[in-house]
From Swiss-Prot:
GTP binds at G14, P15, V16, G17, S18, G19, K20, T21. Gene3D superfamilies: P-loop containing nucleotide triphosphate hydrolases. Facilitates the functional incorporation of the urease nickel metallocenter. This process requires GTP hydrolysis, probably effectuated by UreG. Homodimer. UreD, UreF and UreG form a complex that acts as a GTP-hydrolysis-dependent molecular chaperone, activating the urease apoprotein by helping to assemble the nickel containing metallocenter of UreC. The UreE protein probably delivers the nickel. Keywords: Chaperone, Cytoplasm, GTP-binding, Nickel insertion, Nucleotide-binding. Belongs to the SIMIBI class G3E GTPase family. UreG subfamily. It comes from Brucella anthropi (strain ATCC 49188 / DSM 6882 / CCUG 24695 / JCM 21032 / LMG 3331 / NBRC 15819 / NCTC 12168 / Alc 37) (Ochrobactrum anthropi). It is found in: Cytoplasm. The keyword Glycoprotein does not apply. GO terms for molecular function: GTP binding; GTPase activity; nickel cation binding. GO terms for biological process: urea catabolic process. This is Urease accessory protein UreG.
Amino acid sequence: MTQKNGPLRIGIGGPVGSGKTTLTEKLCKALRDKYSVAVITNDIYTQEDALILARSQALSEDRIMGVETGGCPHTAIREDASINLQAIAEMNRRFPDLEIVFIESGGDNLAATFSPDLADLTLYVISVCQGEEIPRKGGPGITRSDFLVINKSDLAPHVHVDLDIMQGDAARMRGKRPFGFTDLHRGKGVPEIIDFIVENGGLEAR
């Protein structure tokens, strides 16, 4: 999954407003000095997420590429991933030493999944603001992603969410698959996600 076999491809999915772009930004800033990193963002009709990452200086602009998927965003990460595979190939041409590519999906529902041809690892982001019941509703993003990120844990008291219930439901729905609570704006929970990526992505620890 590392250089010999091409870069490690990490899919980041989740509903609109859950924190996908913030997670992508935090991961890029944490990893960019240790690894060669690039990002592909998916939006339906714009390149807004790519622009956000560029403005936040998550990476240099030539390492950020936005693709406009049109229609349903899940099609570009699952049924027909060609637009993303072409973007990854272009990033490989630009940066032959590329080690990590993040593929951020457009906002989608709990049924969104990444094609195994596109992503080696998948991170799925939900927000406590969506409701305490989200983990137990299931769906492939909840049950089959490699790591489930439950974001905006700091807002739980304000939206009347019991994090203990969410934790129990997530554990029950995911079995042995890992998950974690995050407050991405403050960076809480990010180190644990990075540890997971390095350990499970075949990366050399640096």
